[in-house]
């Protein structure tokens, strides 16, 4: 899990 959500 990452603290951010990359915009793909």
From Swiss-Prot:
Species in which this protein is naturally found: Periplaneta americana
Family, as annotated: Belongs to the pyrokinin family.
Entry's localization field: Secreted
Tissue: Corpora cardiaca.
Entry protein name: Pyrokinin-3
Keywords of the record: Amidation, Neuropeptide, Secreted
Function comment: Mediates visceral muscle contractile activity (myotropic activity).
Gene Ontology biological process: neuropeptide signaling pathway
Chief place where the protein resides: secreted
GO cellular component, one term: extracellular region
Keyword Iron-sulfur set for record: no
Residues with Leucine amide modification: 8
């Amino acid at each position: 899990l990452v603290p951010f959500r990359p915009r793909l």
